[in-house]
Amino acid sequence: MLNTSGNVVKRLQQGLAVFLPGIFLLGFNIGTGSVTAMAKAGADYGMTLLWTLVASCFCTFFMINLYGRYTLVTGETALEAFKKHIHPGVGIFFLIALGVGVCGSVMGVMGIVADICHQWSLSWLDGGIHPVWFALFFISLVYVIFWRGNTHFFERFLALVVALMSACFLLNFFLFMPQPSVLVAGLIPSLPDEVVGSGESPLLVAASMVGTTVFSGLFIIRTTLVKEAGWTIGQYKEQRNDALFSVGLMFVISASIMAAAAGTLHIAGLQMTSAAQMLGLLEPLAGQFAVSVFAAGLIAAGVSSQFPNVLMLPWLICDYSGRKRDMTLPRYRLIVFIISLLGLVVPVFNARPIVVMILSQAFNAVILPLTVGCLIYLANQKALMKSYRLSSVQNLVLAAILLFSLFTAYIGLSGVWQTITSL
């Protein structure tokens, strides 16, 4: 009997190991920013922008799969390839841009998580618990797990948090599920009329949904995860299935968040600007249990994205320098410690530094077109890809993604300019 149980556990562990790179990407992608974007879309426009999510997830899968295939064929990560085959400056740009983005994300994510926990604590404690204490708790939790230096332990803990997040948001979907006809109608591309008082046009809301789903950091870190897994072109099917699993779950979770907001706030004619605000709006409509489930999902989303966020910069430095990824080295522990402390900025000062916000917005705007352009260049090189060069159809799809990324870059840079001129 013990032997049988041991075999079952072993098979489960082996099955989990196949999807760990995808789970890492899922945790990285579904954070408080994407939750806010999807919830706002659902609250303001119901499920009419569901097609945007479908298109975003398709683009994300397409890019993840092709970047992963590049690493399977060449054995190189994205930063290695940029440095070696394009120009070292391109690799350095990605290192700086993603590093600044991570710093801004850590501040924002931990600020939102701490605020949500504070709002939640008000329901069972008079005056609640100050956000700083929650931020310190989650920062310490992530850093202690990182300190172990064991990638497998880290990945399994992340898988547990992602599973909790998925369960919470799926439960919310079934609690607030819109009519099936509404879901089907949302798959038909259309732009609804702007909602009075929304503050954002449906086009801007759609662009924010794309921006939080089609994220360059996913594609760059994907190559690192594929190389770390030890996969070669012989495991292309496993790599593709892992990417499909990750993006499929990404769609289900994001659609569930939209549906929760559409089935409550949109029907009631209520609007929101932040994830924490949604808790107060939901309670009179759905009750304390539903709010608690949604809050748990939000917290899990924040924590699951915090893990990859603090690891990303050290991993990218290792990639660019060609060094072994040993996170027990003092220099990497110091980098992660400093990045982790940035999570206290918003709870303490109630705002992110304006310089970080501007730089993060600017880099995010231009990095996606560059990521697509680099892939088109590298994956068409016969000397690198041999018989695995991009097909005509793949080049056409990438060209379409590139054009759309230039459009979102224009919107992003316009937002940066507005921020600068309003100072």
PLM region spans:
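Hydrophobic alpha-helical segments and their helix-loop junctions in multi-pass secondary transporters
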Residues: 163-194, 206-207, 212-224, 374-383, ...
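Transmembrane alpha-helical segments of multi-pass small-molecule transport proteins
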Residues: 121-147, 164-169, 326-345, 368-377
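Extracellular/periplasmic helix-exit of transmembrane alpha-helices
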Residues: 61-73, 226-227, 248-277
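Transmembrane-helix boundary/entry motifs in multi-pass membrane transporters
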Residues: 8-16, 46, 73-101, 122-123, ...
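Hydrophobic transmembrane alpha-helices that form the core helical bundles
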Residues: 91-125, 135, 302-321, 352-359, ...
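Juxtamembrane transmembrane-helix boundary signature
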Residues: 25, 52-83, 93-107, 261
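Flexible loop linkers connecting adjacent transmembrane helices
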Residues: 2-4, 37-40, 65-90, 117-121, ...
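Membrane-interface loop-to-helix entry segments
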Residues: 137, 146-178, 361-368, 390-395, ...
